[in-house]
Amino acid sequence: IPHQMNIRCVTISSYPGTATSSQGATIQGGIPTDLGGAHVLIIDDILDSGRTLGLLKRLIAAQHPASLRIAVLLSKHKAAGRDEHVEVDYVGFEIEDEFVIGYGLDYDGYYRNMPDIVVLPPQPARYLC
């Protein structure tokens, strides 16, 4: 990318251990505090409940960036709606409301290295090597 930019990583988790439903957001490390006046693009793997992206968006918006956009690889279709509504500017794929693994998405630390994104099997422990 031929543009000057600063890339920051923030780790927020909401699925501890073997949980397959969100347990609330936990921030590990910290949120950059020098984003006032900057153009910010949040890139996330998956939009599910909306809680983690909602939290991050509020924390960054409080710093008054020049612009704030959100991109997600996957957005789960929620028939009943999300816990928190988050406007997303860019979506790679819309998926059904199922727990998915692979290509960086994990289940208790496993399956992150799979080359594809697939639905978590009903009894995932039997697939662990």
Tell me what each language-model feature is.
Residues 1-129:
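PRPP-associated nucleotide enzymes
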